[in-house]
């Protein structure tokens, strides 16, 4: 009687996880609609409500993991333990973790569609932080699923762990488990910075193994509808990798023994793009398997679509990625809100180092619109980096450069908005030329900035004193590109002054 009872219990729970899988799929549908609606309803700039409400609203609108990951965890785990005892039915809940991990891959792939996300209406880079945290969560619960069964089989004297793990369907699960387990360590920030290429390859192999092997491993099957949804998303991604890609020639590369490199690409092969757009370059042809396996390199286009060339301004490692030759442009995508380009009236652009590539094309486009206020500030380490301006076709009247040599290592560090005291100057020796009353170098060269500040940090309140007008906040934009410290200062300034804010992270 006990044996028949056990058989009955086992058979009755075989399909017990199917409703939960459908529930998680419903959560994904609801969450997708939530993302779209919140992006449309919540204004992009801080408004004059309480600071915590502003912070909450922007966290929702920008898909910040700080808000969205707890929301997702709450939605998927509230009904996780239901009807069956956790202790008595541990196998059921381990299987449920595996099913949860697989179904959430649908959302994770959805977040990474590019060049622009056609479903959610976000820019590709907007969703990268959420994608990273969701990937970690999916990986961890997938690993818990695998390790949980290994421990269970090891502790059960009635079964052999080896024989269980080497059964066909279970062994396929083990194969899918291995790259996920390695990925958990390879995704650590230290390793990613040390060898992003190896991390990316492991990431690709891990996701392919999970998407295509788990449908064979899982019982009951996850083929319908989950695998077919993922297959459709992968086909969409594959088509975009082919349709949007094109071959391009790098025709010129100028280094000039400085930290910044100017690269010129042939214009004819690239479709039109918006100012501030990025492109991703691959060394491989589309027919080469490495095209699909190896990471691409993102660069920002510093020129406008109506120019005869494509300009890139990059900071390279010892081994340059881009040399004169042939490359594949995987896609071209924009992260700039259209309202900045078409509706703005007052714009301040603050960039550091190679971040000039992001700000430059926006600046050149806005120069054609006759705005009420336009200022472009570029923070660099060395005066010699200004050689880049000789290759860029634009009016430098509204450009100011801050040469920060002999200041702290972060070449784009700015003066805190809460700090008191005078700006710091170093002992840079330079030829005495015409200077304004603050000590800034005045130039008349059409290829030189209107003002060059030596050894001085940017003081947001002083140097942007004419930027903010209370009656024009809706159409006022602060654009920042550079390292985290610059973006943090810029975002703080935008919050305090209730203007629109666009940021782009460059680890320069």
Curated annotation (Swiss-Prot):
It is a multi-pass membrane protein. The chain crosses the membrane at residues 18-38, 70-90, 100-120, 137-157, 168-188, 198-218, 222-242, 347-367. One of its GO terms (molecular function) is ferric-chelate reductase activity. Residues 241-361 form the FAD-binding FR-type domain. Its EC number is 1.16.1.-. InterPro entries: FAD-bd_8, Fe3_Rdtase_TM_dom, Fe_red_NAD-bd_6, FNR_nucleotide-bd, RBOH/FRE. One of its GO terms (cellular component) is plasma membrane. Residues 97-214 form the Ferric oxidoreductase domain. One of its GO terms (biological process) is reductive iron assimilation. Pfam families: FAD_binding_8 (PF08022), Ferric_reduct (PF01794), NAD_binding_6 (PF08030). The keyword Flavoprotein applies. The keyword Electron transport applies. Keywords: Electron transport, FAD, Flavoprotein, Ion transport, Membrane, NADP, Oxidoreductase, Transmembrane, Transmembrane helix, Transport. PANTHER family: METALLOREDUCTASE AIM14-RELATED (PTHR11972:SF198), NADPH OXIDASE (PTHR11972). Probable cell surface metalloreductase. May be involved in iron or copper homeostasis. This is Probable metalloreductase AIM14. It comes from Kluyveromyces lactis (strain ATCC 8585 / CBS 2359 / DSM 70799 / NBRC 1267 / NRRL Y-1140 / WM37) (Yeast).
